[in-house]
Structures are given as C-alpha cells and as structure tokens.
C-alpha cells in the first residue's frame, strides 16, 4: 500500500536518483525520527528497494531487537548490526533505514559512510517523545525516566549524527512533505 497521498515530484525523484547513482541512501537518527516510514516512502519515490536494518537483523537472528539486547547485551547486538550493515551496503542503489545506535558504533559508521549517502532525520525531543512513548519495544528506554534517557541520547548522539552528508528536520508534517525535502536534499547534494 502506498502511504503517499499526494504524488511526489517525478522530476525531483529523477534528479535525486541521478545524484545517488549506484550509492545507497542511508537514513540515520534517533528512534522515532521517522527513518523507516520516510525511508520506505523515499524508496518508493526513487523506484529502488527499501531495507530496514533492524528488520534484517531480526530476520537473520530469528530474535527481536529487544530480545537480542536482553539476551546478548548491547555490545553483541552492535557487532551483529555492523555485520548486517556491511552486507546490506555492498550493492545499491537502495534505501536503508538504520537503528538509532548504528551510526554511533564506529565500525557501523565506517560501513555506512563507505556504502552510501547519509541523511540524518533530526528531530526535537518533544517530537521524538510523542512518537516513542506509546510503545514498549525500545530497549534503551526501559528506564525509570525514559524521556530523560531520550534527552541524554540526543546529547550524546546528535554531535555524531551531525557528521551525516545531509540533514533534514523531522517534524509533524505530512509524510510526503518530508519525502519531498529528502529528495530535494539528495538532488542538490554535490557528489564527493
């Protein structure tokens, strides 16, 4: 089912696709930023495959991300995540959404930078909180004060996310408006 209710500019999508060439477009950012939702719609607009790295990790491990964290700990999860990302980013073009901590892990960050153009969906705390506080599937938020934990993650991670090739502000607007902004950022990016 296509979530885009208004058509995305075909011209803009073509320009973005030309800019990408054979590279992947890799979405990074905190949980709740919209990496999967906007990534999936961006892939549709570009006519390329979409892969959610967390779903791929769950597929190969036959465990949920929460169960992996609980059973093996964050360090082992990050090692598996790095291996999965390396494999996913070997060929393109495709759109890949990553888990919130993927870009923080130095090994994963190297694979991501080598394998694609990075786009950070930067969101403010209140936007993220509104999106994530209704679910209990976020292992890092299983704390006494999850909103404070989210704010701490922002302080720790945002300087690293800022290394991304592109940044788009994630906020409460129609998804197709976000996709247009992503495509415009990609289309206007100068190839390195």
Curated annotation (Swiss-Prot):
Q: Where does substrate bind?
A: 54, 78, 100, 157
Pathway membership, UniProt: Metabolic intermediate biosynthesis; chorismate biosynthesis; chorismate from D-erythrose 4-phosphate and phosphoenolpyruvate: step 5/7
- Keyword Metal-binding carried by entry: yes
Q: Which residues bind ATP?
A: 32-37, 138
Tell me a GO cellular component.
cytosol
Q: What's the domain of life for this entry? A: Bacteria
Q: Looking at the keywords, is ATP-binding present?
A: yes
Q: Which UniProt keywords apply?
A: Amino-acid biosynthesis, Aromatic amino acid biosynthesis, ATP-binding, Cytoplasm, Kinase, Magnesium, Metal-binding, Nucleotide-binding, Transferase
Cofactor dependence is on:
Mg(2+)
Give the record's cofactor note, including how many are bound.
Binds 1 Mg(2+) ion per subunit.
Name the residues that bind Mg(2+).
36
What EC number(s) has UniProt assigned to this enzyme?
2.7.1.71
Q: Which reaction does it catalyse?
A: shikimate + ATP = 3-phosphoshikimate + ADP + H(+)
Compartment(s) where it occurs, according to its Swiss-Prot or TrEMBL record:
Cytoplasm
GO process annotations (BP): amino acid biosynthetic process; aromatic amino acid family biosynthetic process; chorismate biosynthetic process
Q: Which NCBIfam families match?
A: PRK13946.1
Q: How does it assemble?
A: Monomer.
Question: What is this protein's function per UniProt?
Answer: Catalyzes the specific phosphorylation of the 3-hydroxyl group of shikimic acid using ATP as a cosubstrate.
Full protein name: Shikimate kinase
Q: Which organism is it from?
A: Rhizobium meliloti (strain 1021)
């Amino acid at each position: 089912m296509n979530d885009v209710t208004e058509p995305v500019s075909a011209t803009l999508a073509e320009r973005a696709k030309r800019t990408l060439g054979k590279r992947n477009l890799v979405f990074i950012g905190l949980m709740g930023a919209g990496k999967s939702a906007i990534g999936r719609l961006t892939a549709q607009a570009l006519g390329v495959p979409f892969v959610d790295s967390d779903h791929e990790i769950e597929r190969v491990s036959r465990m949920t991300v929460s169960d992996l964290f609980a059973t093996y700990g964050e360090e082992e999860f990050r090692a598996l995540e790095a291996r999965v990302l390396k494999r996913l980013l070997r060929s393109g073009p495709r759109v890949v959404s990553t888990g919130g901590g993927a870009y923080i892990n130095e090994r994963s960050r190297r694979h991501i930078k080598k394998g694609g153009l990075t786009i950070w969906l930067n969101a403010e705390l209140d936007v993220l909180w509104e999106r994530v506080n209704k679910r209990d599937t976020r292992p890092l938020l299983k704390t006494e004060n999850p909103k404070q934990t989210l704010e701490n993650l922002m302080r720790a991670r945002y300087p690293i996310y800022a290394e991304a090739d592109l940044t788009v502000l994630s906020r409460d607007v129609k998804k197709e408006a976000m996709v247009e902004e992503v495509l415009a950022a990609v289309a206007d990016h100068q190839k390195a």
